[in-house]
A protein has these predicted regions:
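Sequence-structural signature of mature extracellular/luminal beta-sheet repeat domains
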Residues: 18-324
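Bacterial N-terminal signal peptides
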Residues: 5-16
Length: 324
């Protein structure tokens, strides 16, 4: 997830919606408003591929945000995502295809992920913490420091089947920080938070700038994108949550990462690039927006790929299912 303070200067600034927990956003066609749309994404086309539904196109679902990030799917297939500079989390309902606000003043949430109990976890960048939201919008702070020092800025996260949380902690200096903007830890690392939220440990300290992160559904492998080094790594996850057997998966970094039921990995940046479990490129989904930040599968059948890109939310129908 790239430094939004640089990217958002290219995007139009919009006013945040009024604060309440969950409410419907009004569809407004005036300049700068958040709009729900249903048009194809420009002239972008997708090369025929067995992963992608026949004739499918990238569709723009909504626009007018400042910078979209962190899509995550709930048990019903609804997709939650962040409008990070506007400090809010939104919901795209798959039932009625409408947009609503889940939470405002969400700690500048970035990466999101649901735990097995249906709580929404967020990398809340305002104070460099990880938050847990219940579905009423109440939150608790799960972590804010390591060994007595503030985190640099938790960026993205994945929940292991055992309930533990793997997360990345790069440094992207934010203009809204009141803290010292210098590096808080002695590097930009990957961490693990135990299922009871009591133990935190570094699991990879030999990485330049970890960003996107995802694990295999069986909990045996972890994938971490090093966006600075333009590499993505795969690790074996041990019973004690440590990582071993680190290998280069592909020579491409990524802002966000997701995985499908066949084990294919979806990396972002300039559109969405898909790699098979061997690390071989097998598809590319172009997106008209200048920067594609993150992706997740959603929908009732988990066969829709949702894409957060710049000031927009997109989707495309797939032949493969995502995983939770």
């Amino acid at each position: 997830m790239v430094k939004t303070s640089i990217l958002i200067i290219f995007f139009s600034i919009i006013m945040s919606a009024p604060a309440n927990n969950i409410k419907q956003l009004n569809v407004d066609t005036t300049s700068g408003a958040t709009n729900v749309v249903s048009t194809s994404a420009g002239k972008e086309t997708v090369t025929d591929n067995e992963l992608i539904a026949k004739g499918a196109k990238v569709e723009k679902l909504a626009d007018g945000f400042r910078f979209t990030e962190g899509p995550a799917v709930d048990k019903k297939g609804n997709v939650y995502f962040t409008d990070q500079p506007n400090n809010r989390i939104l919901i795209w309902s798959v039932k009625d295809e409408k947009l609503s606000v889940f939470h405002e003043n969400c700690g500048r949430a970035n990466g999101l992920y649901f735990d097995k109990k249906g709580n929404l976890l967020s990398c809340s960048d305002m104070d460099n913490e990880i938050w847990k939201f219940d579905m009423d919008g109440n939150h608790v702070v799960l972590i804010s420091d390591f060994e007595g020092k503030k985190m640099n800025g938790p960026n993205d996260l994945w929940v292991h089947p055992n309930g533990g949380i793997y997360f990345t902690d790069p440094l992207y200096k934010r203009d809204y920080w009141t803290r010292d903007p210098k590096m808080q830890q002695d590097g930009e690392y990957v961490y693990y938070l135990s299922p009871d939220y009591k133990k935190v440990m570094r699991v990879d300290s030999e990485i330049e700038k970890p960003n996107g992160i995802i694990g295999s559904p069986d909990g045996k492998h972890l994938y971490v994108a090093d966006i600075k080094a333009s590499k993505t790594y795969v690790y074996d996850i041990q019973p004690d949550a440590t990582l071993t057997n680190k290998k280069l998966f592909t020579n491409m970094g990524s802002d966000g990462v997701t995985i499908d039921s066949q084990g294919n990995l979806y990396l972002t940046g300039r559109g969405v690039t898909v790699f098979n479990p061997k690390g071989e490129k097998i598809a590319h989904i172009p997106v008209e927006a200048g920067w594609t930040a993150n992706v997740c599968f959603g929908g009732k059948d988990m066969k829709t790929l949702f894409i957060t890109a710049s000031e927009n939310l997109y989707s495309i129908r797939m032949n493969v299912k995502g995983t939770r």
